[in-house]
Amino acid sequence: MLITKIFKDYRLFEIFILGIVSGMPLVIIFSTLSVWLKESGIDIAVITTFAVARLSYSLKVFWSPLVDNFKIPFLSRWGHRKSWLILCSSLMVLVLIAMSKENPEVSLTSLYFLTIALGFLSSTFDIAVDALRIDKFDQETQTIASATAVFGYRIGMLITGAGALYLAEITGNNWQLTFVIIAIIFAVATIFIITVNEKELVREKVNITSIISWIYAVINPFKDFFKREFAVTILLAVIFFKLGDAMLGAVASPFYIELGYTKGEIAIIAKLYGLIATLVGGFAGGIVMYKVGNFKGLIITGIAQSLTHFAFIWLNHQPPSFEALLIAITIENFAAAMGATALVGYIGNLCNKKYSATQYALLSSSSSLCNNTVTIYAGKLVNMMGWDGFFIFTIILALPALFILMYLNKKVNV
């Protein structure tokens, strides 16, 4: 079992802890913060503009060479990768403490920029963690190392998702204390990072030749992808496929609060149980793809994930109850995970094996970048359309991807 291997191999334990730290800021930005803002009386249109902090996760590829090559003064003696981890983790402690001192009702702008800073530091931390993991393990053990990192990432998401919401609930809405405790966890993690063993590699000095080589290494996979027929159309299908889900996710937590659900209920059902439904749905999506193939699997899961948004319209007209939220979360998370699994398989199938890593990054980053940009306006749409109208709109958003995929299936082998 994975858990047994983590505690037998200390290197895996290190990656597991780093994975936890990586996963923690993401949920603060994507969900937990929106609950705090909603409870503080902030308008939904303003809340979703905080999604701009997510853009760092989509754009981090552009400063990853800096993390690879720039030595941080003083800290680099601990190790190149560790120096970046220590810097980012330490700064995240300061940002979280600063966030704990803010009151959204009177200092929303400060909180906005602190959230953007947290997103940037977190995404940079992710770059260094991935690099450290790749450096520490050989090719044969990369799979188990990646699985360990993902497992840790999920635990981190639970800590700042379900854990933070439940903590805020039992402390009587004390969000300031909640963020201080999260900051303390990061401070402890920073101390742990200092003890992590880093495999120091001989690094080539950066010169004009290496820079040119790197540019070609980035450009060639892009050129290869866009040389293919219907490349832009394929890219549009990938972008639209999860757009409706992204819009729904941006407003889900404030929606639950508006319906009258407590933070404790959201923590247990939407976050903790929701993760289980997501994992089961991901497994089911893999089975569907295996049984019916890439294209049919993508269409089936695409239709399923869009139609499940009707569950939120139903939820909007139910009195707050444990059972109603459980049903809606089960349906939505299960179908969304099926769709996500199908999309990963489809993107992987599109990539030229020669440039698989870069082309996969191009397609997945394009999707997340567009999704994170558009979700900024989700709150305004809720105010314009009302909740029912908004959920219908998220269902309609899936249609372009499905029509494009059907069109492509007739024209090319996708």
UniProtKB/Swiss-Prot annotation:
Transmembrane segments: 15-35, 44-63, 84-104, 109-129, 150-170, 177-197, 230-250, 268-288, 295-315, 324-344, 360-379, 389-409
Keyword set, alphabetical order: Cell inner membrane, Cell membrane, Membrane, Transmembrane, Transmembrane helix, Transport
A Pfam family per the record: MFS_1
Intracellular or extracellular location(s): Cell inner membrane
CDD domains in alphabetical order: MFS_AmpG_like
A single Gene Ontology CC term: plasma membrane
PROSITE patterns according to UniProt: MFS (PS50850)
Any GO molecular function: transmembrane transporter activity
Protein name: Putative transporter AmpG 4
Lineage of source species: Bacteria, Pseudomonadati, Pseudomonadota, Alphaproteobacteria, Rickettsiales
Gene: ampG4
